[in-house]
């Protein structure tokens, strides 16, 4: 667990600095958005170069824990490079998924290196996920729990709890030693809890659940449509990049490109536009 925390935590720390750098470059040079389709071509080329043409992302990490699917170590540099390229040119790829894939592939590689059995190797995958997530977001306890939860909704792998916590804390220590601090969103006051607020929170929870379901359905359906109309992955990614450019031009700004941290800050400040969730 300590080794996983050091290695995956180091990778997560490097990933953090990489994300910070490309975001800064994109912010200073907004014209980079017009190179997004070409960045997509580079990403597809990288995956094909390493013979990983059918990558399934985070799903592959989860499958590796459940059904012993092969989780190649080459996924680490692929997800690292492709995520940085995506954000450099204005794409919006979630850092959470990248952290899980990066850490999971490193954890699996460590498990293979020490010839662990399947059970211990699965724990190492979760340790790697926890470590990378912790280093990137600065939330060691949340990283440990999240990595165990995401593997199977409603089921907790308690045998992995202590190793994941250790990996997360080690990774967090490494990140802090390099000067990384977690992003804080301060709330001035919290309203008292009562019947009225309970009803509002319940309605909000239902709406968020509905939007989440709709978002997942749209992701799967759009992927199927892209593959149906554009068989060639190079054409597919180029068209996708062009669509993002058109949407960005229609919105008139790049507030919805990249990580979306600015949108979270606006939500906390109460200055966010009502349709921001839909535009994002």
List the model feature ranges, each with a label:
Residues 1-280:
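Alpha-helical transmembrane segments and immediately membrane-proximal extracytoplasmic
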């Amino acid at each position: 667990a300590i080794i996983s925390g050091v290695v995956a935590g180091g990778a997560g720390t490097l990933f953090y600095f990489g994300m910070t750098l490309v975001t800064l470059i994109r912010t200073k040079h907004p014209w980079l958005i017009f190179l997004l389709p070409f960045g997509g071509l580079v990403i597809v080329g990288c995956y094909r170069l390493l013979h990983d043409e059918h990558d399934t992302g985070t799903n592959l990490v989860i499958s590796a824990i459940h059904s012993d699917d092969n989780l190649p170590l080459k996924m680490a540099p692929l997800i690292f490079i492709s995520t940085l390229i995506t954000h450099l040119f204005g794409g919006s790829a979630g850092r959470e998924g990248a952290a899980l894939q990066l850490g999971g592939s490193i954890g699996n590689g460590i498990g293979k290196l020490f010839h662990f059995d399947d059970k211990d190797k699965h724990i190492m995958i979760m340790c790697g996920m926890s470590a990378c997530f912790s280093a990137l977001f600065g939330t060691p306890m949340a990283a440990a729990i999240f990595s165990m939860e995401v593997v199977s909704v409603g089921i907790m792998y308690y045998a992995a709890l202590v190793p994941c916590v250790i990996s997360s804390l080690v990774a967090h220590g490494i990140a802090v030693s390099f000067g990384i601090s977690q992003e804080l969103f301060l709330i001035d006051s919290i309203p008292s809890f009562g019947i009225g607020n309970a009803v509002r929170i319940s309605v909000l929870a239902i709406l968020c659940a509905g939007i989440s379901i709709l978002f997942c359905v749209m992701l799967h359906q759009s992927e199927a449509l892209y593959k149906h109309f554009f068989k060639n992955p190079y054409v597919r990614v180029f068209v996708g990049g062009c669509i993002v450019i058109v949407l960005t031009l229609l919105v008139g700004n790049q507030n919805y490109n990249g990580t979306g941290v600015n949108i979270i800050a606006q939500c906390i400040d109460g200055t966010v536009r009502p349709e921001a969730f839909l535009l994002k």
